[in-house]
Amino acid sequence: MEKLTILLLVAAVLMSTQALIQEQRQKAKINLFSKRKPSAERWWGENDRRVFGSCTADEECCFNNCVQAYCFFV
């Protein structure tokens, strides 16, 4: 009976250790994916300038061409 109790305790410790290791791996994967930048952000950089879309000033557009509240590619 004593051996069975010890065996069950060892099994419980091993299972809890395995669960903790898997949880840490999941957190590491989440951190890895959260650090990645979207492809558009990698291509254009981290500025907020637009190629197309609405604007209020030339500085908001990539090509500094805000015409009638819209960025134009020229």
From Swiss-Prot:
- Quick one: where is this thing mainly located? secreted
Q: What is this protein called?
A: Conotoxin Vc6.11
What information about domains appears in the record's comments?
The presence of a 'disulfide through disulfide knot' structurally defines this protein as a knottin.
- Tell me the protein family, please: Belongs to the conotoxin O2 superfamily.
Renumbered to this chain, the signal peptide range is 1-19
Subcellular localization(s) per the UniProt record: Secreted
Keywords, alphabetical:
Disulfide bond, Ion channel impairing toxin, Knottin, Secreted, Signal, Toxin
Record keyword tRNA-binding present: no
Q: What does this protein do?
A: Inhibits voltage-gated ion channels.
